[in-house]
Amino acid sequence: MKWIGLAVMLSMAPFVRATVDNNNPIANSKAVVICGNARFTVLTPEMIRIEYSEKGMFEDRPTFTVVNRNLELVDFKKKEDDRFLYIQTDKVKLKYRKGTNPKTSPASPENLTITIENHGCETLWYPGKKDPLNLKGTCRTLDGSNGDNKRSELENGLISRSGWAVIDDSWEATRADGSHSFALEPNLEVGYDWWAYRNDPQAIDLYFMGYGNEYKKAIGDFTKIAGKIPLPPAYVFGYWYSRYYSYSADDYREIMREIEKNDIPTDVMILDMDWHWNGKASSESENIGGWTGWSWNTNLIPEPTKLLQEIHDNGYKIALNLHPADGIDSIESPSYYKAMSRELEGKYGSDGKIAWYLDYPDFTKSFFDNVIRDHESEGVDFWWIDWQQGSNCKVEGLDPLWIFNHFHYLDNKRDGRRPMTFSRYAGPGSHRYPIGFSGDTHITWESLDFQPYFTTTATNIGYGWWSHDIGGHMLGYKDDELTARWTQYGIFSPIMRLHSSCSEFNGKEPWRFKKETEEAMEAALRQRHCMIPYLYTMNYRKSEAKRS
């Protein structure tokens, strides 16, 4: 079979390794200009932060989107007269009518403008100006997508043929999922930065980026303020085995034998949700458990620690799938429910269940200490956070998905490990928490056709580590040629993970297909394995050079 000719490797360009540890959210005072209730921070020659607060309360803490504002000082000129303040770098010219709100209704250039040069012509921007030429970013999920029916959900990215883009980090500027960009503050109880309300919820907080067609520089400078894109552990560059199916321990052993027999280099083994009691007869759960579960289904996997050790002995890293929304039930392992009930003093529990409150520090600490630590001591390396319950929680405007990604990633970082998590996209700033799970797509040629575009535009918001269900997840149709082509695309996508729904007929194991398809799929997977040193080296070089 011919190889699919896609220039998707370009989507891996923004990958860099860095940490958020050395970030400083307080800008150098020499980069700041205050004019009444307005504050301007010159971050780069092309990027200016614009704040306005009627209360004169500006934000110097990190936020969900921006974590660093202390950049190398930029030469700029400032002058003012009775009516206007002017700020000019060698790339942008800002003009602000003193004593006014930069935003007008309807949007107009009356109170604030920024002028840039784009393709040899002057371009004027003002707050609220629409941009029909934005090259787009990404969206929360491809769940239920068939072809490009999610195209309209793509959020704006940081690059545009207009020559400018804006990050609106104001509290009132709700994200695409309806949530807000909270501030972050240290929390001694959990040991991580915790969400906090903004100083002035009505304040304007914009980051203007006037980079013209210097697209790489725009993304690179975004990561200077929003945090670098970490380099995950080396094993993520290989092939991930994944299937939603009620496998027993012996089934997993047979899969490992087939993988070895067929000489398929494999680095990650994912155990989907049937590892725990889920209430389904098909998984021998005896009406115990449900969509959410934390305790091993010992009918299928009677000796979990032994199985995980065997998987490790075969050279795989291990992830477990989680749907956490229903909390901790009393039918779970007594050590989980009782320990958390005791520590939380019944605070979040009723009717034999501890409700899900990851947005509160005492719950978070107890959950990680009792549930996550226990499974990781058994051999779990990372977690697949399969959150599908929307963007609402007890704290208005706080997206639980962002909380999951933030805390699971930081927790996975302990003991000096190179961290990672595996979850859906939760808005700008999510690039700090790789890897992304794009969701449940239909098995169609149209879905394959859209995936390279979707993967590439995500890098326009710095989000380079999408993991797709290669081959599609559900519905659609069975087509050997489609599976082979999708697998061939997969080796050039950021993460190579074949996956499928819980159907007898949807398995993506190469040995389930006719000979021609099997050989094409296995050749692709071996090719991906050969690329690991290159992929890792190039990403490492980029990280050391601090380039996007």
Language-model features: where?
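A low-complexity, Ser/Thr/Gly/Pro-enriched, surface-exposed linker/loop concept
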Residues: 43-82
